Amino acid sequence: MKIALVQTELVWEDPGANLGHFTELLASEVSSTDTDLVVLPEMFTTGFSMSSAQFAEPMSGDTVSWMKSKSQQGGYAIGGSVMMQERGNFYNRFILCHPDAEIITYDKKHLFRMSTEHDHYSAGARRVGFSLNDFQICPQICYDLRFPVWSRHRGDYDVLLYVANWPSARRSHWLSLLRARAIENQCYVVGVNRVGADKNLSYSGDSIVYDFHGETLLDLKNETCVGHVTLDQLALNDYRQSFPVWKDADNFDFIEDLPD
């Protein structure tokens, strides 16, 4: 599977400018013959904004329409997170649009309280996966990365996909945790971050792809660019069979509410 990672600056709270910028990037840097999946950062139309009441869109809005159009025109799936409004609630939602018009959504589970995200958005309640070119992919968003139980491999995915607005001040955490998720889950890990600065923070990029050994396949460092990587399903399967750590994993389940 061939993936394009889009690492770029974002214009603060300006969806039109950001969609225009991504339109130009996709036209110049992404080929439909060499790409199965395009990954955009977290909140790619606004930056990591708490202005949900002002900028959140319905699923019938301009951003999802743009994603569907680009996916169908380019012949590749495209995914990233956007602030969304649904039934009176706001969500930091990962959206995946497939060329055949299928749409997959995942609402961020762990909201970043240090930026009061939990005061402006509702948390998601379920982990989601989707299939693409025989790969099973589990999308997660930024702060989710710090919670390994939520990403624990249970035989249901081959790729962990993180989209983020992860600040420069904690870049070592980003790189270390992504690599740990790859090793402990024996999977590919794709992390797509932004560069530049917004109203509050600066971002160093560090979009990266680790294989199931924790070895680096692609590192975009702090460049504004589109990076390309190819993932090998056979190599992953062979490794999991030859070194089956998963057979000794502890069993667990999610418990929503414990009795008093």
Please describe what each predicted stretch is.
Residues 36-37, 137, 159:
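Structural motif
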